[in-house]
From Swiss-Prot:
Assembly with partners or alone: Part of the 30S ribosomal subunit. Forms a tight heterodimer with protein bS6.
GO biological process: translation
HAMAP family given in the database record: Ribosomal_bS18
Keywords, sorted A to Z: Ribonucleoprotein, Ribosomal protein, RNA-binding, rRNA-binding
Keyword Oxidoreductase among record annotations: no
Name recorded for this polypeptide: Small ribosomal subunit protein bS18
Coiled-coil features, chain-numbered ranges: none
Task of the protein: Binds as a heterodimer with protein bS6 to the central domain of the 16S rRNA, where it helps stabilize the platform of the 30S subunit.
This protein's encoding gene: rpsR
Recorded family membership: Belongs to the bacterial ribosomal protein bS18 family.
InterPro entries: Ribosomal_bS18 (IPR001648), Ribosomal_bS18_CS (IPR018275), Ribosomal_bS18_sf (IPR036870)
Length: 95
């Protein structure tokens, strides 16, 4: 049974009649690319695309970047095109 004190912050879980455990909920942030005045996803903008690529050169998943599914697909396609056109490296060198 979950009892919610503050729906977005904490909840108390009661397991039988034993001890109560606190369960913390984090409110999911909105998509940073869906807000007004957000930058346009374009393969010619490597400064934006590099923010969504890991240190090793892999594309970061949407659960880490908080990007919605529609924008994540556009990002992935833009990163792939930028790599083919040599605007982004396929693999980043270890420093």
């Amino acid at each position: 049974m979950l009892k919610s004190n503050n729906a977005s912050e904490t909840a108390t879980r009661k397991v039988g009649d034993k001890t109560a455990k606190k369960v913390f909920f984090r409110r999911r942030k909105g998509c940073p690319l869906s807000v007004p005045n957000a930058p346009v996803i374009d393969y010619k903008n490597p400064e934006l695309l590099i923010k969504f690529v890991s240190e090793g050169g892999r594309m970061l998943p949407s659960r880490i970047t908080n990007v919605c599914a529609k924008k994540q697909r556009k990002l992935n396609n833009a990163i792939k095109i930028a790599r083919i056109l040599a605007l982004l490296p396929f693999v980043f060198q270890a420093k």
